[in-house]
């Protein structure tokens, strides 16, 4: 399973510069990666763990068309699953309208708005079960889903805040989803900085989105369903935010 999350199309008021950067990432780096993974494993699938769009109130037409084009291309080569993230919803729960409806008519693409059990097959053999829990807006509801499916699935895919992990600002998350309620491993979107423990993996955004990403190596996770192991491929393509000391900046010449 190829995992991606928090791609946030429409960032910075639908900036054309950001659209171009994101478009290049998908067409020149990510889609070629997907094709390489498919060459190794024809049964591979793609799961996006939420926040395809940035703005929950209004979506720029050019941004929407770009997103549709990209996912039409992806779905033409690999089965795609997309969970609702909080930025994809009109309300702070999963009861409102979803901007992902724009993608609902794409063949080979499944939108996950309600908790769904996914069963994956490789070589005609059932190798893994995943409980997909989209953003529900209430940690208590998400905890109930983890308890309900605790021993029924190998992994939980989510878009949520998880206790004992970190917000992007470094503060510890408290009073949120309790990953210990689930017997398997929890893999989630929502937090943009990558984090890994034995129990939880925040896969993070695939590219830098703001200065809060300074120092965070972005990339793509791939989940091997046979070994149940995650591997990480760094994104060495996209621009990054960085800090430059004032003295060093002042000494830069025009060619730097």
Where do the protein language model's features map onto the residues?
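Conserved beta-sheet core of the metallophosphoesterase superfamily
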Residues: 166-229
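Binuclear metal-dependent phosphoesterase catalytic core
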Residues: 118-123, 203-256
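Extreme N-terminal starter segment of soluble prokaryotic enzymes
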Residues: 1-2
């Amino acid at each position: 399973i190829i995992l991606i999350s928090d791609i946030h199309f429409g960032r910075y008021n639908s900036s054309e510069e950001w659209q171009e950067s994101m478009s290049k990432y998908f067409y020149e780096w990510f889609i070629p990666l997907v094709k390489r993974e498919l060459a190794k494993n024809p049964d591979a699938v793609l799961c996006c763990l939420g926040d395809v769009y940035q703005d929950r109130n209004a979506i720029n037409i050019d941004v929407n068309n770009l997103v549709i084009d990209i996912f039409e291309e992806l779905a033409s080569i690999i089965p795609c699953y997309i969970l609702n993230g909080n930025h994809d919803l009109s309300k702070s729960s999963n009861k409102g309208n979803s901007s992902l409806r724009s993608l609902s008519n794409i063949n080979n693409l499944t939108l996950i708005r309600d908790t769904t059990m996914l069963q994956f097959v490789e070589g005609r053999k059932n190798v893994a079960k995943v409980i997909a829990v989209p953003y529900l807006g209430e940690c208590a509801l998400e905890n109930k889903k983890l308890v309900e499916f605790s021993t029924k699935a190998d992994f939980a895919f989510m878009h949520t805040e998880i206790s004992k992990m970190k917000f992007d600002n470094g503060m510890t998350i408290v009073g949120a989803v309790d990953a210990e309620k689930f017997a398997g491993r929890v893999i989630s979107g929502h937090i943009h900085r990558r984090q890994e423990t034995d129990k939880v993996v925040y896969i993070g955004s695939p590219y830098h989105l703001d200065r809060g990403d300074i120092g965070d190596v972005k990339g793509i996770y791939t989940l091997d369903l046979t070994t149940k192991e995650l591997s990480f491929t760094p994104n060495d393509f996209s621009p990054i935010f960085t800090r430059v000391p004032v003295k060093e900046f002042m000494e830069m010449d025009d060619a730097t």
